A protein has these predicted regions:
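Short, conserved loop/helix-junction motifs that constitute active-site signature segments
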Residues: 90-91, 108-111, 228-231, 261-266, ...
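Short, basic phosphate-binding NTP loop
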Residues: 2-148, 156-168, 305-306, 346, ...
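Acidic, Mg2+-coordinating active-site environments of NTP-dependent enzymes
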Residues: 104-106, 110, 234-408, 496-498, ...
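Glycine/aspartate-rich loop-and-adjacent alpha/beta segment that forms the canonical ThDP
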Residues: 531-564
Length: 585
């Protein structure tokens, strides 16, 4: 398994905006933008005199506006973007795209004569306008592959991009960890950027001669119209499990947001994993709800059986099935079999966990549909390589990333119930396959200002699967972190009490508020044969305490704690067998 490189360092909003933009954008006349909206079926009222020099950029953020930009003023949770229009205009914005409420705010600020495009749905219109300004839309940009689902988007995207490169395609990535356009990389702040930034990125990728780009598509991106004006050649679905209910309200609404990606107006072809995550319920429903033509994938004997799929839909048979799954080092070898023709693709994935087999299989099918069936033999050739080699051996920063041995130490982004179940199960399976016996320790918390109902559930999951549970802070955002920890601990302790009563097993539960101290505590408690899972933050390098960003990289902190353990063992003369090993990035 290859070692992941660290994500690029964080940038200021202005630096990131500059990194997104193409080097040159011809001016688009004001009437052309009004015409583009009309062609998209968006009613727009034009106010004020048209700017003489046209529009050369589009921005939703008044802090990063450049001369020649159209400023997009959207209604927000705390304030309307039009309240910041004066700042944008002072920076050189030549006009404003907003709604009726925004135009009224402009008038209140003495800006009634500013050129305005007034629409009802500002975010949808922003995508249409940005596509026209940056020359995107239609077939002018890179071929787009989308990936949506609760868990697995990042890993699937990284693996798909690696496959494309192996096939000689110049690829791009847009996702949670980073944004890459050819050789250029910038850190990411959103899983899916705003529509204005995405269309600038598509223009940048054209400049960088990117052939195909893989994009993570969050439910927020669909709901907030961040992907407006984009079209996907193929889009994939990983799974749907509890998360983001603070925004969506129910699993049904969450499902509907995800399903929006597979509207035929947005996507040419869909690849749906039927039995990912908690089982076939949502995958089967997504296959039926997708308006675009669908190819289906099932994990086969390692997951819900074809019979289980039939219970949800008697007429459903997966087009492709994962078969002949076997451990291969930390990862797995598997065969992807086409049900109708019997054609097989043999592959090896380096990441631990059966769920990463599902991610790898989905990546393979996305790439197959992107490059075309005529390239099936070439794809088979790059997949069928020895263990630890080839594109699917690629590691992903903070995704089941192994940072130490003796004890086994793994960092993962698992931050919801199913993600935690899968990460703990994967660690246990990999250790069992290697013949390692010992305890499992988990260190985790839960982010603030997010779905609160999942916190005690995650605590109970940790108590069921681990021997030592250390509850600590995650990024609390605006919440007091102590009640977050208490909520998790309530679920963990209730489950630990049940386990002690019914199974006679003791689960050790500790609370260590400081995350770095919690990591050191886990390393202190772990024996050489134990396994440590540090869950929740993955690749992230800062924690947000009510607006104060505190630097902390879980991978660095865990490596430092392990290195201190190695140094202490060497100094005490306890011998190399007890020193352990730190795996550097």
């Amino acid at each position: 398994m290859t070692t992941p490189s660290d994500p690029p360092a964080a940038l200021t909003p202005a630096e990131q905006d500059a990194a997104f933009r193409p080097s040159d954008t011809p001016a688009t006349p004001w009437p052309v933008l009004a015409q583009a909206l009309a062609e998209a079926g968006i009613a727009a009222h034009v106010h004020g005199a048209a700017p003489a020099d046209g529009v050369t950029g589009v921005s939703l953020d008044s802090r990063v506006v450049r001369p020649g930009d159209l400023y997009v003023a959207v209604p927000g949770a705390r304030a309307h973007g039009a309240a910041f229009a004066a700042t944008a205009l002072e920076a050189g914005a030549v006009g404003v795209l907003t709604d009726a409420a925004g135009r009224a705010l402009l008038a209140e600020q003495g800006l009634a004569d500013v050129p305005v495009l007034e629409v009802d749905a500002v975010r949808t219109a922003a995508g249409t306008v940005a596509a026209r300004v940056y020359g995107g839309g239609g077939d002018t940009g890179p071929r787009l592959l989308g990936v949506t689902g609760t868990n697995g988007k990042t890993t699937t995207s990284f693996l798909a991009a690696a496959l494309l490169e192996a096939l000689g395609r110049r690829s791009g990535i847009v996702g949670t960890i980073l944004i890459r356009a050819g050789e250029r990389e910038v850190p990411s702040t959103l899983t899916t950027p705003e529509a204005t930034q995405l269309h600038a990125l598509m223009a940048l990728m054209r400049e960088e001669e990117v052939d195909t780009a893989v994009m993570e598509v969050s439910s927020h991106a669909v709901a907030y119209q961040r992907i407006a004006g984009l079209r996907y050649a193929v889009a994939g679905f990983t799974n749907l499990t509890q998360d983001h209910l603070d925004m969506h309200g129910s699993m049904q609404e969450y499902f509907a947001a995800k399903a929006g990606l597979f509207d035929p107006a947005r996507t040419d072809h869909a690849v749906i994993t039927l039995d990912g995550g908690e089982g076939p319920r949502w995958g089967v429903a997504m296959a039926r709800a997708a308006g675009a033509p669908v190819t289906t994938l099932a994990l086969g004997p390692a997951a819900p059986t074809p019979g289980a799929l039939a219970e949800h839909d008697p007429g459903l048979r997966a087009d492709w099935e994962v078969a002949e799954l076997a451990p291969d080092g930390l990862g797995h070898r598997f065969t992807l079999r086409h049900a109708a023709t019997g054609r097989e693709l043999r592959a090896s994935v380096g990441l631990p966990g059966r769920f990463n087999v599902a991610n790898a299989a989905l990546a393979v099918l996305l790439v197959l549909h992107a490059v075309g069936e005529e390239h099936l033999d070439a794809l088979a050739a790059v997949l069928d390589v020895p263990a630890g080699e080839g594109p699917l051996a690629a590691a992903v920063p903070g995704r089941m990333e192994v940072v130490g041995r003796e004890p086994d130490a793994v960092v993962d982004f698992a931050h919801n119930p199913d993600g935690m179940v899968q990460a703990l199960r994967s660690l246990a399976d990999a250790r069992a396959a290697a013949g390692t016996r010992g305890r499992t320790l988990i260190v985790f918390g839960s982010a603030g200002d997010r779905d609160r109902d999942k916190r005690p559930v995650m605590g109970a999951i940790a108590a069921r699967a681990a021997d030592v549970v250390i509850v600590t802070d995650d990024t609390p955002h605006s919440e007091d972190p102590a009640p977050i920890r208490a909520h998790i601990l309530a679920g963990a302790r209730a489950e630990a009490d049940r386990i002690a009563r019914e199974e006679g097993r003791t689960v050790v539960i500790e609370e260590v508020a400081d995350r770095a101290a919690a990591i050191r505590r886990a390393v202190e408690l772990a024996g050489p044969q134990d396994g440590i899972l540090l869950a929740g933050r993955g690749h992230e390098t800062t924690m947000d305490y009510d607006g104060e960003l505190v630097p902390l990289d879980d991978r660095v902190a865990l490596r430092e704690a392990l290195a201190a353990r190695v140094a202490a063992a060497s100094a005490s003369g306890s011998g190399p067998a007890r020193e352990g090993k730190v795996i550097e990035s």
